[in-house]
Regions:
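Active-site pocket-lining segment
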Residues: 12-15, 58, 121-190
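N-terminal extracellular/periplasmic Venus flytrap/periplasmic-binding protein-like
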Residues: 20, 26-111, 121, 174, ...
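Condensing-enzyme catalytic core mediating Claisen C-C bond formation in acyl metabolism
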Residues: 71-135, 139, 146, 204-205, ...
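Cysteine-centered functional microenvironments
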Residues: 17-24, 29-31, 83-94, 156-163, ...
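Internal helix-turn-beta structural module
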Residues: 152, 173-183, 188-226, 230-231
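Flexible glycine-/small-residue-enriched beta->alpha junction loops
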Residues: 1-16
Length: 238
């Protein structure tokens, strides 16, 4: 009631970010294509098998679209603003899903012979303007890096939730992240963004990637509706 101007769709926040950072439709589509290509390759290699539990016969993410290209994306209508740049193809799809992780003390894990994937170093949250909701990971990641006494260059693996291509690109730019380190097996634009599951999914994925790639530090970060962000830095135990 007191702030009616703040009631808008997440898609409009993506358009706001695209305008603020002067991101073209093609730039966003390039990012979406990359996410789909990485997810397609990871799926063909069986990289997701360790991470997926079959439910009612479903054992594969349905959002992956191997044939995504510029021509296909060019045909899509603008989803939120007729004068904007964001389409369904550059947004994370609505998907059903669930994720779980086990967080415990190291002693408990060892006493119970549990496979330790990684160690949590620090986590941080931050707020931003609600109309620029997707920028939340910037401040949250900066806080987490400072608490961990690390720089972005020290981070080997980044799992950045792809709510929209525009906000992902903005976060990558402001955090100065090496694109080669981001979402190695694709992100939410290809895999989906089931509400309530994303934090566990990307953090668990980051831990799995540290082991697979034999790296030391990973950053898992996501935006949150109404103008928040969260970031977690984890360390390999290998």
């Amino acid at each position: 009631k007191n702030n009616p101007h703040l009631y808008f769709s997440m898609g409009i926040t993506a358009e706001n970010v695209a305008k603020k950072y002067q991101l073209t439709r093609k730039e966003q589509q390039d990012f979406a294509i990359s996410s789909q290509q990485k997810a397609t390759e990871a799926d063909s290699k069986g990289n997701f098998k360790k991470e997926i539990t079959t439910v009612n016969g479903c054992s594969r993410d349905e959002g992956i679209r191997p044939n995504t290209n510029q021509e296909v994306l060019d045909k899509l209508k603008l989803a939120f603003d007729e004068s904007g740049t964001v389409t369904a193809g550059t947004s994370s799809p609505l998907t059903d899903g669930a994720a779980t992780t086990l967080i415990c003390e190291e002693k408990f894990a060892k006493d119970n012979n549990l496979d330790i994937l990684a160690r949590i170093i620090t986590t941080s949250v931050d707020g931003c303007e609600p109309e620029l909701m997707g920028l939340g990971p910037i401040g949250a990641s900066q806080k987490a890096l400072k608490r961990a006494n690390l720089s972005i260059e020290d981070i080997d693996i980044v799992e950045l939730n792809e709510a929209f291509a525009s906000q992902s690109l903005a976060c990558i730019r402001d955090l100065n992240i090496d694109r080669k380190k981001i979402n190695l097996d694709g992100g939410a634009i290809a895999l989906g963004h089931p509400l309530g599951a994303t934090g566990a999914r990307i953090t668990g994925k980051a831990a799995e990637l540290l082991r697979r790639e034999n790296k030391k530090y990973a950053l898992a970060t996501q935006c949150i509706g109404w103008g928040m962000g969260i970031a977690t830095i984890i360390e390999s135990t290998n």
